[in-house]
Amino acid sequence: MVRLREIPRTATFAWSPGAASPLIATGTRAGAVDVDFSNQTCLELWDLALSRHETGGELQPVAKIDTDSGFNDLAWTESEDNSRGVIAGALENGSLDLWDADKLLNGSDDAVISRTSKHSGAVKALQFNPKHSNLLATGGAKGELYISDLDNIANPYRLGGTAARADDIECLDWNKKVAHILVTGSSAGFVTVWDVKTKKESLTLNNMGRKAVSAVAWDPEKPTKLVTATPLESDPLICVWDLRNSHAPERTLRGHESGVLSLSWCAQDPDLLLSSGKDNRTMCWNPQTGHAYGEFPVVTNWTFQTRWNPHNPNFFATASFDGKISIQTIQNTSTETAQAIADQNQALDGEDFFAKAQTQPQVSSFSLPKPPKWLERPCSATFGFGGRVVSVNLVEKGQRASKIKITPFEVDEAVGKSTETFETALKEGDLRSICESRAANAGSDEEKADWKVIEALISKDPRKGLVEYLGFADQADEAADSLSKLGLDKEEEVNGEVAKESRGSGAKKHRRLQSMFDANPEADSFLSDLAASKGAKTNNPFHIFNGSENEADTGITRALLLGDFEKALDVALKEDRLSDAFMIAICGGPKCIEKAQEHYFQKQTNSPNYVRLLASIVGKNLWDVVYNADLSNWKEVMAALCTFADEKDFADLCEALGDRLEEELRNNEDKGMRKDASFCFLAGSKLEKVVAIWIEELREHEQKAIETAADDSAFSIHVRALQGLIEKVTIFRQVTKFEDTERTKESDWKLSTLYDKYIEYADVVATHGRLQVAQKYLDLVPEKHPEAEIARNRIKLATRQATPQRTQPAAATVTRAALNKPLPQPNAFQPQRAYSPATPAAVPSPYAPAAAAANAYAPPTTATNPYAPSTASAPAQPVNPYAPPAGGSSYTPAGYQPPKAPAYGAQPLGGGVPPPPRASNQSPAPTVTTYTTATNLPAWNDLPEGFAKAPTPRRSTPAAATVASPFPNQSPTLTQGPPPPAGQRAPSVPPPPKGTAPPPRMTSPPAAQPASTTMPPPPANPYASLPQSPPMASTMGVPASIPRGPSPYNAPPTMPPPPNRYAPSPAAQAASPQLQTRAPVPPPPQAAASPYAPQPPAAGHYVPSTPPPHVQPPPQQAPPPQAAPGSRPSTASSQKKPAPAPPKYPPGDRSHIPADAMPVYEILSADMQRVKSRAPSSFKAQVDDAERRLNILFDHLNNEDLLKPNTIADMAELARAIQARDYETARTIHVDIMTNRLDECGNWMVGVKRLISMSRATP
């Protein structure tokens, strides 16, 4: 029930036909006087722009044309010749005018189609036939009723006699089922049914004493039913008639307090009827049962016309004599956010003089007991997350009861089976059989090669497996056989024993690529063998020096004799005696061997290729082989890597070789190299590289399969390919024990393409009901991945087990040992629903303070107490003489939200005043179930959040008496407040004073107050009895019980104390909790002399609709609120408040504003001057007040106090947003500062907020 748009006109109106964006045609109402006393009459067209969530300023007409007279009625119909149709106007001067809507919208001068004046007096009503859009019925003064054909508009024919009648035809309506039946209602009370085909009167209803008829409407589905309305203020009735009994109405609808002026029966749902009248109200009825659903917001003058939108019945419009046509919706919006903002603003504006001059329009809301017919569905089905289909069917045809069925559903059953098979195989752990199976069923050579390589990696010696896969095992055996024929690998006996091999495991002598120094194992023990033959005597004597040696021989011999093997090596190398040099190097150790090898390789410039390979192997520089070997020998390079590469370099060497193959692939597009590169990446465990190749292969194979498939769908093909990819990656990760080191990163992942496939696969398997499998793969994706986070949350919600609900007894009590003599606790609570319906108003709470500014437990906007009265449209509360007057502190933390209610059964700190008992003749309040309550729970008729803007405050809107229940013939729901919040025990409030003098008023707390100790919070169970705690000592006695009957908290009948002009209203107080915990205030000294003096507030006054907050920090963290300027001096304490520190510079001085704050001053002051120069004179007070508050801000900036640097920076950004007319950004910054930095806000914050609003409204 939200007002979406307003047209500022006192006019009759008509909706545009068709499904296009709705337009409204308005014609100046005859006899009405506008605010300017203008006598101009015109026809205007308005574009409602309902597709836009918000509109700035008033609506402006899109077309306008002046007329000769005012309008009594308007009608708009479709036309074959005009896309936008034809508009007909019933004018006060008796003219019937027709306009072309297309030409009006185009601004054409010849928009008038025709102008006829067959009526001798004013035309009162007109309507197009719903079946034949060219037929137009018009009724007017002296009983004249004409039927016009648009094809021959100049020659209408008249129904009924030509004799003049004294009564006027005030209304008419075509039958919605029978095209030639028409009904009219006259001022003399005649309701006549006409047969246009025979041009005769069919029957006249006995209209209950011939009371005047102001409106008539046919049932949209039943051709014999209609409703009529009477405009009499003494007896406003809506009568439902069935033509089969024309002597008496079938039923009467009573609810209006004054005459009914308009009716509109919904064409899409015959159970919905709108009525409006002289009581300023628009009501919604069920004419089939006579039940009144509720009423819409009351306006300030008669509502003379209401109409459903003919195409979209979610909308309707109502015209009233207060100068507005309101376009509303029957749907509810979530108003809690808007209410919170309104309460917050009201709290901020609590001291403002003009804030109290305006009142909020009455907010009415009700819920239909069943959805409208156009929203009903006899059956429906939807796909649910997790492989489920939810279907709804009627239990029995014709009944409203439905049954819900949830069934599993799989798009492709093969997907589910393959997923289960793979997961089962993984649990068994037989990876080799998986690889063998997938390789055997591979669809391409590349896929088969991948599985074979992964299988090779499973072996205990992966490198040996890779070499064997490359086919080098057979070649090595062949080379060994060839060498055996040469007799180079015979095992020789040394000292009668076979020499043992010096190589490692599996290495044979003289195998391919073995070192030339390992060919003869006896070389390692050459010298030792010579030494072992110490005692042997041979027949081959020799001379160390025989005189024929050259200088080189002598040098080598001398060096050997002295053990200087390095010098001997140098001489041998210099003489190029490589054989001798290598033998000497063997004796000299590793250093000499390395030197001899280096010299040897330097000399071999034109040597065979194996020499360079040998150099790389000996020098442990396999990078030379990887980067420089021809790619046609990549297998040989890979075999060398598997044989000689260090473990730490092996992966990088394989990756480098694979990169070379990929680069060559891009150059010559040889698809075979992609498989070779994949092998290298697999061997090096480079998942990020091989995944890119696999995904590319997936796309190609998928496209090829789609082109050749006969029966498979594209989805099934894609899912099977995706399944294969996931299986390969999963097995590869397990085989190589891959660890993803980037899961903690927030972006720039190397495996981002794989993560996308994981998310896609998780979505597929989740769609097939495998939520656990989906969760498993989503856990492999980084936590900060946005899409994975959404998917994980969906699965978490889908797999969440429902919490078992404990049944609450109807009335639960908690038995505890009494700590002291308890106050009497009558069981005043009655079980009700956990959510009270959004009633327009409730009985004022007899123990809620009228305006407790020092209340530390002011409630948030969301009520969680089932006994809390709704605050949707509560009237102003009477001034409570027992409530302390409100302090006018600028410290109003409106953004503060108390924590949640404590757990059940917690011990309270103390009671307050118990709820008053019900009178003995009262019965428990009936439970009313509504579809929409003041909660965050959505209902069927909720609009999207933010669709409609909150109602704008208007001046002088009466707070009309509201209905306590949206359903008639039911007793109003009495609501009870929750138990008092936590706090120390305060004495009970005595009866009202009998004297004439007002009680002393307390305007500020004592300067020093003790901090409250931390105690358990009170129970959240609304049905539990209130536990007791010992009362505090008091100068007054505690009454034995609370008397029944009128509440002792009501104001005394004589001479109530004057209300504090600056005290915020209860709604404002509810949104302005104090951040400090207040201790009980001791009674004033004068209290001893007056036993009826009011008690000071206890710690945390009780306010309805508030969950008990936890204990707050001690009062040193926030200063106590200051007294209002106009409040009386405190009588509660002789202590004085500390005087505020004087400013460094006088007010108005702007010469000391720092540079970073200067944009705030310059932009805001300039925009304030712009608003001030263009604002209407009637808003001068508001503009001046906003300027005054901005000057407070500028003073703070000039003194460099209150505002911190980050707040000044945000204010500068806010100012620049205002300068750029980006008011949404400015408002967002304003709310952020007000919410998160409340200690820096003050009166100046209201000025900034008002400047944003005024600047937005100022052109």
From Swiss-Prot:
Keywords linked to the UniProt accession: Cytoplasmic vesicle, Endoplasmic reticulum, ER-Golgi transport, Membrane, Protein transport, Repeat, Transport, WD repeat
Instruction: Give the principal location in a single coarse category.
Output: membrane
Q: Where is the composition biased (Pro residues)?
A: 977-1003, 1045-1061, 1105-1123
Q: Which family does it belong to?
A: Belongs to the WD repeat SEC31 family.
Topological type in the membrane: Peripheral membrane protein
Region feature Disordered, mapped onto this chain: 822-845, 868-1154
Organism of origin is Aspergillus niger (strain ATCC MYA-4892 / CBS 513.88 / FGSC A1513)
> What Gene Ontology cellular component terms go with this record?
COPII vesicle coat; endoplasmic reticulum exit site; endoplasmic reticulum membrane
What is this protein's function per UniProt?
A: Component of the coat protein complex II (COPII) which promotes the formation of transport vesicles from the endoplasmic reticulum (ER). The coat has two main functions, the physical deformation of the endoplasmic reticulum membrane into vesicles and the selection of cargo molecules.
Note the segments forming the WD repeats.
5-47, 66-109, 118-158, 164-204, 208-251, 255-295, 298-338, 382-407
Q: Output one GO BP term.
A: protein transport
Quote any Pfam family the record assigns. Answer: WD40
Q: What is this protein called?
A: Protein transport protein sec31
Enumerate the Gene3D superfamilies for this protein: 1.25.40.1030, Functional domain of the splicing factor Prp18 (1.20.940.10), YVTN repeat-like/Quinoprotein amine dehydrogenase (2.130.10.10)
- Is-annotated flag, keyword Amino-acid biosynthesis? no
Give the signal sequence positions.
none
**Quaternary structure per UniProt?**
The COPII coat is composed of at least 5 proteins: the sec23/24 complex, the sec13/31 complex, and the protein sar1. sec13 and sec31 make a 2:2 tetramer that forms the edge element of the COPII outer coat. The tetramer self-assembles in multiple copies to form the complete polyhedral cage. Interacts (via WD 8) with sec13.
